[in-house]
Amino acid sequence: MSNIEDYPFPTGLHLLTQWQSGDEAARKEMTAFFDDAIAGCFDADFSVLAPPDRVHSTASVHMLGLTILHDLYNIESWAYYNTDPYRYVRTNLAVSRLLGIHKFYTTWALYAFTCEPLGQQMMYPDRFPP
């Protein structure tokens, strides 16, 4: 099992960089890390509140999460956003941790979730957000 504490900033960022460059060992490590994240092994860590004496900032990481899951598991866009909320949230929180973000936020493709119930048809490409 992976230990999320093994990926403090910038270690997690270095792993992401190696994976993006096509390093096969990094891909295997990423797969093990995300297997554990998706299984809920890091949920206790995700529940720890960020220190209140700091200013926290983050970015929308859902697109990087989609890219990772498409590469590692061949999960396509529609399935990523629509089928498993636990996988979606855990993936985003794990990506945040690898990027060195201390306060966890969950972001999503709000435009897709608001336009579809109103009758609009969304286009879900295989590995890009709607």
What are these regions (language model features)?
Residues 1-130:
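Catalytic cores of TIM-barrel enzymes
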